[in-house]
């Protein structure tokens, strides 16, 4: 059995692969449709439009994967360097390089991230843009050349090895076991050497002698891929589940097997499903003594049936059906396990949070030795985490601890972070950025009991000289006070649902000149990730971190809903009476955030903010 730490690493690796592939699944679907329609054996053959097929699978798709991989490691700079490195992989070989892209992209991101860390603080003022551009260009060039020279020989060696393995099994009359080599080779686009070097010559010879050949269907059987896609349709989640239906049509009826490759690449355990499906399919063909009279191209069920002799129809259909069934069962098992693992992780986080609330210390005080800084992180580092950090900072100050408490976006967490607090739905993502930090999960950033217990543990550890009372404010403390005016306060509102409330807050931010109209859409995108309801009747809708370019200047609008607005359908007590729309350029809005968290200590203040019809009272409380 894998240890808990090993399981987390496997899960994180799987999520990383998925995050490289899934943003680009639309491009795979587009390529699949173009291929199925316009190639010579497609539904609408078109010589001109068919020219799109080769460049898209050779260049576009690997570049997109490399770009996404680099971006996951080091943002936009990592994406650019990752794409440059991937170009070296593409040119270094004559087959589509998905696997190479999944290596080159993150490598490019890692390289530029290491350089940026080394260069931090060493660049003279005024030379930042010059150094940034040239560093990414030079590092990208070096990696592209390196991958160009390395990838060709590596691919050739791997292809030769797979072909040799198949040849040994064929000569030993162990045909079903050839799928152990064939299915992984298909996923990596290394099947040409097997097809053209072994299966085609043997298939032609056997077909001339017996009128059919099993070798024509070992690689072309659509069953294994069909099983995986059906498993995603039923047990998948997110974009993978939503797109699997269209991919199934392209794969099974269009014969474009490449369309299911990304679904396996992002979850490598599914290789076992397609291998088992392939083995069972070939075994069925041997059992029924079935085969095709000629190669089926493309490998759709229609082309397969057209190449099937009358006496082999039952065997071929049984082969496809059994291969699909076996692949489906095994893929479903792995996808269900993945869901359960994620669910168990969430349950553990929730249990930990409840333990904190009840006063149970689930981390020994010794673990806090040396902690000097605490990060409260959320997706954008703007609203939710700012509130939590403000509340925790106040408690740390009252305890006399010399510990800095700051909020930030998860993507901005430093590698050397010691202690990180996130919403339970974002903890796994935070762990990817800072795997060596202590991570705490909560489901309410305004959970005072959580912070009380944490501060108590920190105090017991004596992490700092208690004689030195120092509450460190965020490094980017505002230079000028943020001004909240009566034009930014809206009282006595009503909304049928949270969407209305969020849109109202967003439109007021636009009207006040704080943001561009596109920021409103980003507020809805942020809400889809994790609810911005904080608890205590307060919600702080704001945009995603990608939407910061749409922020013209820092602004806050306070919207009061005396009758309340339900923010989480599955939580009865998630009724927000204060909906505070936030757009932050820097940290000027923290003044209002701090005032709100201070008001939480006073039940009368929260009641007044939620019910008063006097704007001046609201301003007085939030300016306190």
Swiss-Prot record:
Pfam families: PTS_EIIA_2, PTS_EIIC, PTS_IIB. GO terms for cellular component: plasma membrane. Residues 13-336 form the PTS EIIC type-2 domain. The chain crosses the membrane at residues 25-46, 51-71, 135-156, 166-186, 274-293, 314-335. Keywords: Cell inner membrane, Cell membrane, Kinase, Membrane, Phosphoprotein, Phosphotransferase system, Sugar transport, Transferase, Transmembrane, Transmembrane helix, Transport. It is found in: Cell inner membrane. GO terms for molecular function: kinase activity; protein-N(PI)-phosphohistidine-mannitol phosphotransferase system transmembrane transporter activity; protein-phosphocysteine-sugar phosphotransferase activity. Its EC number is 2.7.1.197. CDD domains: PTS_IIA_fru, PTS_IIB_mannitol. GO terms for biological process: phosphoenolpyruvate-dependent sugar phosphotransferase system. It catalyses: D-mannitol(out) + N(pros)-phospho-L-histidyl-[protein] = D-mannitol 1-phosphate(in) + L-histidyl-[protein]. Residues 372-463 form the PTS EIIB type-2 domain. The modification Phosphocysteine is found at residue 378. The active site is at 378 (phosphocysteine intermediate), 542 (tele-phosphohistidine intermediate). Induction: Induced by mannitol. Repressed by MltR. An intramolecular phosphotransfer takes places between His-542 and Cys-378. PROSITE patterns: PTS_EIIA_TYPE_2 (PS51094), PTS_EIIA_TYPE_2_HIS (PS00372), PTS_EIIB_TYPE_2 (PS51099), PTS_EIIC_TYPE_2 (PS51104). It is a multi-pass membrane protein. Its main location: membrane. SUPFAM superfamilies: Phoshotransferase/anion transport protein, PTS system IIB component-like. The phosphoenolpyruvate-dependent sugar phosphotransferase system (sugar PTS), a major carbohydrate active transport system, catalyzes the phosphorylation of incoming sugar substrates concomitantly with their translocation across the cell membrane. This system is involved in D-mannitol transport. Homodimer. The EIIC type-2 domain forms the PTS system translocation channel and contains the specific substrate-binding site. The PTS EIIB type-2 domain is phosphorylated by phospho-EIIA on a cysteinyl residue. Then, it transfers the phosphoryl group to the sugar substrate concomitantly with the sugar uptake processed by the PTS EIIC type-2 domain. This is PTS system mannitol-specific EIICBA component. It comes from Pasteurella multocida (strain Pm70). The lineage of its organism: Bacteria, Pseudomonadati, Pseudomonadota, Gammaproteobacteria, Pasteurellales.
